[in-house]
């Protein structure tokens, strides 16, 4: 029963608050706040990179305002960790894309997860994208077009879930084609596409258009230098596009970092539908309570950092030292500037520093790192692979993080390091510009060159010899706001902006 109206027509408080609240909301989200967060990896189950961390954190950060549900492929690793999966819906075949059941689980914190089930497409060993041998799955186009089409079917209410979202949030090229499938079928569900790394575009030959169910008259939307790009199709058809940092959103509109899509992205920016939002990091990254640390510490109590440094030196076979400890927590690839680190390593060692490296990647760079450990025993140590507990202890014990990435859409390692009082030494690009305050919470250098990195290292060594300045910078880094509450609030606003772009949605039942 609605509250009674006062004589004279003004509503009583409860109804008045309801009306005033809903008058402020976009009409497209006033009645329901369902969002389908479509992603190809999620750290709860399987992770190939930073996207998996974002997918695990962002939907949870938004659930206080939206009914956010996640859609992810049913990889073998997902099914092993999911436990009992309830079949709740089904998407039909489309062109060469097979029909798939949709399973559902609910995480312990209440987050609903839809799992796209296909033994043929997803139940394999390896990562979401490559086999155990490191080669891409040959049918990735079919696999991720199936995921995208399933998202569009759910948005249209055709999957039998008894629920459909008012907005699709699509992540990177594996999900980007969903925006196209929505539009090509006459749908009006607003689509937000988040680009986590523009370099990965989902390129496939034109000959696959029919198999993917792309209308002949729309193939040009995907055209990319003689191939089709899933990501380009998403950029063209999404209502709004965002990247994972403000600076990266600007940089990709130019040829240097636009990866061949700069003119298209510049056009979207000119229309006000390209935005940058810096990622957050999970609250579990807390040096006072982190489960991976034997010795905890805070901005007011530093002893635990020294204990962690000793553990890191022991784990990497480094000698006891009072000099600075430099950490490298990264994929060992050219993009991350590992070749630059290999070039400056002799300077670091000569100045009394030590280096601990964890990660894997390009065989040539792995060999260069291994050679450094042989050349400088006790001063350079490496673990080829990844182990999260060890990585966290490195952040908690090292003095500096080396991060000379040639490009970095956002980057998470620098924020993890800052939270633990480890100062990033980073190339001024993308999200590193937005998250590292030069001389305050870390150090930036302007050009991805050996000489620029050397000059920045000299600044870091000078700071290390000034304990008061070093402590002040550590405190500033640890206190820098980097939680998902900040990023989450910006995504809430972006959801409402994106929904407002498609006013026809209000008429969809």
UniProtKB/Swiss-Prot annotation:
Q: Report whether Transferase shows up as a keyword of the record.
A: yes
Which GO MF terms does the UniProt record name? alpha-1,4-glucan glucosyltransferase (ADP-glucose donor) activity; alpha-1,4-glucan glucosyltransferase (UDP-glucose donor) activity
Q: Which InterPro entries match?
A: Glyco_trans_1 (IPR001296), GS/SS (IPR011835), Starch_synth_cat_dom (IPR013534)
Q: What EC number(s) does the entry state? A: 2.4.1.21
What processes does the entry annotate via GO biological process terms? glycogen biosynthetic process
Name the domain of life.
Answer: Bacteria
Residues bound to ADP-alpha-D-glucose: 47
What reaction is this protein's catalytic activity?
A: [(1->4)-alpha-D-glucosyl](n) + ADP-alpha-D-glucose = [(1->4)-alpha-D-glucosyl](n+1) + ADP + H(+)
Q: Name one Pfam family in it.
A: Glycos_transf_1
Pathway assigned to this chain's UniProt record = Glycan biosynthesis; glycogen biosynthesis
Key word Disulfide bond present? no
For this UniProt record, the keywords arranged alphabetically read as follows: Glycogen biosynthesis, Glycosyltransferase, Transferase
Enzyme type, top EC level:
transferase
Q: What Gene3D superfamilies does this protein map onto?
A: Glycogen Phosphorylase B
Which PANTHER family does the record cross-reference, listed alphabetically? GLYCOGEN SYNTHASE, GRANULE-BOUND STARCH SYNTHASE 1, CHLOROPLASTIC/AMYLOPLASTIC
**Summary of the function given for this chain in its UniProt record:** Synthesizes alpha-1,4-glucan chains using ADP-glucose.
Q: What family does this belong to? A: Belongs to the glycosyltransferase 1 family. Bacterial/plant glycogen synthase subfamily.
> What's this protein's name?
Glycogen synthase
Q: Which organism's genome codes for this protein?
A: Xanthomonas oryzae pv. oryzae (strain PXO99A)
């Amino acid at each position: 029963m609605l509250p009674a109206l006062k004589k004279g027509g003004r509503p009583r408080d409860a109804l008045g608050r309801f009306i005033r609240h809903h008058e402020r909301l976009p009409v497209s989200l006033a009645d329901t706040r369902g969002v389908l967060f479509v992603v190809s990896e999620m750290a709860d189950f399987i992770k190939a990179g930073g996207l998996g961390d974002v997918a695990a954190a962002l939907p949870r950060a938004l659930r206080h305002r939206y009914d956010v549900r996640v859609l992810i492929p049913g990889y073998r690793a997902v099914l092993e960790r999911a436990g009992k999966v309830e079949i709740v819906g089904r998407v039909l075949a489309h062109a060469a894309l097979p029909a798939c059941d949709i399973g559902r689980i609910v995480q312990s914190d209440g987050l609903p997860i839809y799992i796209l089930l296909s033994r043929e497409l997803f139940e394999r060993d390896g990562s979401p994208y490559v086999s155990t041998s490191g080669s891409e799955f040959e049918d990735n186009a079919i696999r991720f077009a199936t995921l995208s089409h399933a998202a569009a079917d759910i948005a249209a209410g055709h999957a039998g879930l008894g629920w459909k979202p008012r907005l699709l949030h699509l992540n990177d090229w594996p999900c980007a084609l969903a925006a196209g499938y929505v539009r090509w079928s006459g749908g009006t569900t607003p689509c937000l596409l988040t680009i986590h790394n523009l370099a990965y575009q989902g390129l496939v030959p034109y000959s696959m258009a029919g198999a993917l169910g792309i209308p002949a008259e729309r193939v040009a939307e995907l055209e990319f230098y003689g191939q089709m790009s899933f990501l380009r199709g998403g950029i063209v058809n999404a209502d709004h596009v965002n990247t994972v940092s403000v600076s990266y959103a600007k940089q990709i509109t130019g040829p240097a970092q636009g990866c061949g899509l700069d003119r298209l992205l510049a056009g979207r920016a000119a229309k006000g539908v390209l935005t940058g939002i810096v990622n957050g990091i999970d609250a579990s990254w807390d040096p006072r309570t982190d489960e991976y640390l034997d010795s905890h510490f805070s901005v007011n109590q530093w002893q635990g950092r020294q204990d962690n440094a000793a553990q890191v030196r022991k784990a990497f076979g480094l000698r006891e030292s009072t000099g600075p400890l430099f950490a490298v927590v990264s994929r060992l690839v050219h993009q991350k500037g590992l070749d630059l680190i290999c070039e400056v390593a002799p300077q670091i060692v000569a100045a009394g520093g030590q280096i601990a490296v964890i990660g894997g990647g390009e065989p040539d760079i792995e060999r260069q790192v291994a050679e450094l450990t042989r050349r400088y025993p006790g001063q350079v140590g490496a673990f080829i692979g990844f182990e999260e507990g060890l990585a966290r202890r490195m952040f908690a014990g090292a003095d500096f993080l080396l991060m000379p990435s040639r490009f970095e859409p956002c980057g998470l390692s620098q924020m993890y390091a800052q939270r633990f009082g480890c100062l990033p030494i980073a190339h001024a690009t993308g999200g590193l510009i937005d998250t590292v305050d030069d001389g305050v919470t870390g150090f930036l250098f302007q050009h991805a060159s050996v000489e620029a990195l050397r000059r920045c290292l000299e600044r870091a060594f000078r700071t290390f010899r000034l304990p008061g300045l070093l402590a002040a910078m550590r405190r500033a880094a640890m206190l820098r706001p980097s939680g998902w509450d900040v990023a989450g609030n910006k995504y809430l606003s972006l959801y409402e902006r994106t929904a407002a772009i498609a006013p026809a949605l209000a008429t969809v039942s």
